[in-house]
Amino acid sequence: YLLLLCLPLTLMGTGAVPPGPSIEIHPRIVGGWECDKHSQPWQALLTFTNGLDGVCGGVLVHPQWVLTAAHCIGDNYKIKLGLHDRFSKDDPFQEFQVSASFPHPSYNMRLLKLLLSDELNDTYYDEISLGADFSHDLMMMQLEKPVQLNDAVQVLDLPTQEPQVGSKCHASGWGSMDPYSRNFPRTGKLQCVDLTLMSNNECSRSHIFKITDDMLCAGHIKGRKDTCGGDSGGPLICDGVFQGTTSWGSYPCGKPRTPGVYVKIFSHVDWIREIIATHS
C-alpha cells in the first residue's frame, strides 16, 4: 500500500512514515497466514542496494520483467525472486539489478511528489484529499538478465477477462502485520491473506480518494484482513487468475467495510505487453 500522505521522499515506497493525517496509501498483510513455501513463485521483493530491505513487492510477468506499483519508484533497486524467508541465510533466491524502470505514463507523479513533499499545507491537502485520483499505479522494471525458471521462480500469466464481484481472492507480501504501525515492521516469511472482491460503488463510499474503473477493491465487511505497509506492488489473485496489484488503502489497515484498493490488471494488459515488446 502507499501510505498516502506520509511517505518521506527519501523513502518512496518504503512505507516508513512520519506522523500525519490518516490518509494513506500503505502496504502490508494483516490477518493472514504464512504462505506455503514457494506457493507464490511469481512473488518479487524490491530492495535498495544500500541495504534497506523489503520496500515493496512485485510480480514476475515475463522472464526479464517485474510489475510493481508506480509509487514504489526509486533509484538503485535490486529485485529478489524465489524468496520465502527474507531473514534466512539458507533460503536460496535469485537477485537482479534493475536495468530500466517504466512507470505508467498516466500515473499522477505530480500528486505523489506533492504528497511526499515537505511543503504540504491546507491548500495542497485539499487537492490531495478531495477525490484525488491514483489510477494506473503501475511500473514495469526490466531485470539486467532473464531469471532462471524453476519450482521457486515462475512467470504469472496476465488475465484474459475481468474478475467478478464476489470472487475469492488472495494477496501476498512481506509487509507489516500490525494494522496500526506507522513504522511498518515487516515479516520475515511471505504472508498470504484471503480477500473477497467488492464492488467499486461500495468501495467509493469508504474512501475519500477516487475509485475508478481501472481499480479493484478487495477485503471483508468485518475487516481484520488486508494488505498493508510494505505489500505494494504484490499480486492479487482471484479464482486462480492474476487480477490486481496492491496499491493503496486506509489507516489502520483492515478497517471494517473499508477494502484495500488494487490496480485492475485487465485494464493495463496492452500497456504491459507494449512495454515488453518495445524494450526487450
Swiss-Prot record:
Enzyme Commission number(s) of this protein: 3.4.21.-
Record-linked SUPFAM superfamilies: Trypsin-like serine proteases (SSF50494)
MF (Gene Ontology): serine-type endopeptidase activity
Distribution of this protein across tissues and organs: Submaxillary and sublingual salivary glands.
Positions annotated as glycosylated: 99, 121
Active-site residues, as the UniProt record annotates them: 71, 137, 232
Main location: secreted
Name of the protein this chain belongs to: Blarinasin-1
